[in-house]
Regions:
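Catalytic domains of carbohydrate-active enzymes, especially glycoside hydrolases
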Residues: 37-64, 256-264, 298
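Short, basic, glycine/proline-bearing loop/turn elements
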Residues: 30-33, 69, 280-281
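Active-site region of glycoside hydrolase catalytic domains
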Residues: 2-14, 84-320, 330-408
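N-terminal carbohydrate-binding accessory modules
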Residues: 1-55
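Aromatic- and glycine-enriched glycan-recognition loops and surfaces
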Residues: 35-54, 71-86, 90, 115-122, ...
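Short, well-structured secondary-structure segments
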Residues: 57-67, 93-97, 308
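Short active-site-adjacent helix-start/loop capping segments
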Residues: 23, 59-61, 67-71, 103-106
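Conserved strand-to-helix beginnings and helix N-cap segments that scaffold or border functional pockets
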Residues: 73, 77, 319-325
Length: 408
């Protein structure tokens, strides 16, 4: 069997384009489509070419499910056909984000719709079957725990559930969809590989909303569910059962366990770590490379699966981004030298994104631009968004040319 491209002992460099899609709208809630807001639909070819120019070997890039399947079972492949062909022609590998927060408009109640797991699996199967040999690397669903917090615990995104009960309902539905997605893709493309991506979570202080044990276990709940670990005696079994999840629903995961090929760790030094205030609000805590090391080691020790840094960057000045690029890569190389198989490094986002708070505001998108990328997006007098290479772009190119100095 041919060795997968990530397993050749090199450190592979990639970038990712922010691809949050929440198309539902309501009073005080605008739809958010990051591709539309960043004019990626118009500039996708330039954006992909820029990624290759930066030195990226792979890109984390998502599919807007709500546009590709505008009606149940009816697919519009025209744009994806063009994009996939261009990626192949320029030699840019894609780790396909099949789900990045939002569902199609026709799926009422979104993630808690009883048909969601099979709907998302059917969509994933159709994508995998059509693009087999071009796109063979998949993330079934990006950041499931964040997804469950926003959609099930905080009531921020549809279906707007709240509390532990809502979190439990959403995370179980998401995890079941992830299992069915991996099963369906594997059925039509045996060469497919899977990168499970979740947000890193770290906490400081004592004013926690749940016990520290529950919080620390809950950050792993999606991966523990899909790999069949949440059985009686597991801390999350009691948590989920206590919030209305039936025993037969939990047992389903043990009977249908899947294992991803890689674990993707998302880490941002400025806000992955938080401190809770007594009133329940949170403040971000700067954690630097110590936080990155901590999360990578936690996932490696728990699952024993190869690691990919699937998102990291720092907002603010170009100087701060330059510093983080160097610091984070040095930490990754130290971990590799110690025997931790960190196989990939992804600067995410590749270019400017629009803060999610845009969805709950009336101000123009430009007021919510967050510059964290190798490329800054700047609006011109003609309203077009220009892509402007920063010094971080050149520094990333240089690091790619140098390559990793240490092999895993």
């Amino acid at each position: 069997m041919t060795t997968h491209w990530l397993r050749d002992e090199r450190l592979h460099f990639g970038v990712g384009i922010e691809d949050t899609f929440v198309p539902q709208q309501g009073i005080g809630r605008r739809p958010i489509d990051e591709y539309e807001l960043m004019q990626h639909y118009e500039n996708w070819r330039e954006d992909l070419d820029l990624a290759v120019e930066a030195g990226a070997e792979f890109i984390r890039w998502g599919i807007p499910w709500y546009l590709v399947e505008p009606r149940p079972g009816e697919f519009d492949w025209r744009w994806l056909d063009e994009v996939s062909a261009h990626m192949q022609s320029i030699g840019l590998r894609c780790v396909v984000d099949l789900m990045h927060y939002g569902t199609p408009l026709w799926l009422d109640n979104q993630f808690v719709n009883a048909s969601y797991p099979e709907r998302v699996a059917s969509y994933a199967r159709a994508v995998a079957e059509r693009y087999a040999g071009v796109w063979d690397d998949f993330t079934p669903l990006n950041e499931p725990v964040i997804n469950a917090i926003y959609c099930g615990e905080d009531g921020t995104w549809p279906p707007y559930l709240t509390g532990d009960d809502g979190f439990s309902k959403v995370i179980v539905a998401l995890a079941k969809g992830m299992v069915r997605t991996q099963q369906e893709i594997a059925a039509v493309n045996p060469s497919a590989r899977f990168v499970h991506v979740d947000a890193g979570f770290r906490w400081e202080g004592d004013d926690l909303p749940l016990s520290r044990e529950v919080l620390e276990e809950r950050r792993f709940v999606s991966l523990d569910l899909i790999t069949g670990r949440v059985v009686p005696g597991h801390p999350m079994h009691a948590y989920l059962a206590g919030n209305g999840i039936r025993e037969d629903d939990l047992a389903w995961f043990a009977d249908n366990a899947v294992t991803p090929d890689y674990v993707g760790v998302n880490y941002y030094p400025g806000f992955t770590t938080v401190r809770y205030r007594p009133d329940g609000a949170t403040d971000p805590v700067e954690a630097g490379t110590a936080g990155l090391r901590d999360l990578i080691e936690l996932y490696w020790n728990r699952y024993g699966l190869p690691i990919v840094v699937t998102e990291t960057s720092r907002g603010g000045s170009v100087e701060s981004r330059l510093a983080w690029l160097g610091e984070s890569l040095e930490e990754v190389e130290r971990l590799r030298a110690e025997g931790v198989p960190v196989l990939g490094y992804t600067w995410f986002p590749f270019f400017t994104l629009v803060d999610w708070l845009y969805r709950h505001d009336a101000k123009p998108a430009d007021d919510w631009f967050v510059h964290m990328g190798l490329v800054d997006v700047v609006r011109g007098a003609d309203r077009r968004l220009a892509r402007v290479r920063t010094e971080v772009f050149a520094a990333f190119q240089e690091r790619v040319r140098e390559g990793a100095t240490v092999r895993a």
